[in-house]
Amino acid sequence: MIISSWNVNSVRARIENIKEYLKKYSPDILMMQEIKAQDENYPYEDIEKSNYQNYVFGQKSYNGVAIISKKKLDKIEKDIFKDKNKQSRIITADLKHKSKTIKLINIYTPNGNPVDTEKYTYKLYWLENLIKKLKGYLKKKENIIIG
């Protein structure tokens, strides 16, 4: 199984590159970060024509994550913890592979630069909440964490 990760820095601006990548390498799963598109503006059809399913947690102009997969994924979760800034930064899904269920976790971590700013404080808050949530996942099943 091939699982790839790509910070695309705008899925719409890179859609031709994404389609080319899918055709050339044929990953089973591609996890994308910084898609910079709301769900309704995401290029679903372009990716579906490449025989992939889309699982999207979009946001206008910034952030956003997506998982595209050849197989149907289950238990899609967005907002796995309450983000006080309501940013689209994590999407999870269950992948059934052979006799196992694997939790896919696609993360786009906040930039905290510079130190001693509100952005840095937010990043620390966000990472603390992420770690709490991941500890629960790590106890239950196999996980693939990418981002």
List where the protein language model places each region.
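A long, amphipathic alpha-helix that forms part
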Residues: 120-141
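Short, flexible loop segments at the rims of nucleotide/cofactor-binding pockets, characterized by
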Residues: 6-11, 79-82, 121-124
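Structured beta-strand-rich core segments of catalytic domains in phosphoester-bond hydrolases
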Residues: 35-38, 42-114
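Short, contiguous clusters of charged residues that form electrostatic/catalytic patches at enzyme active sites
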Residues: 13-16, 88, 125-132
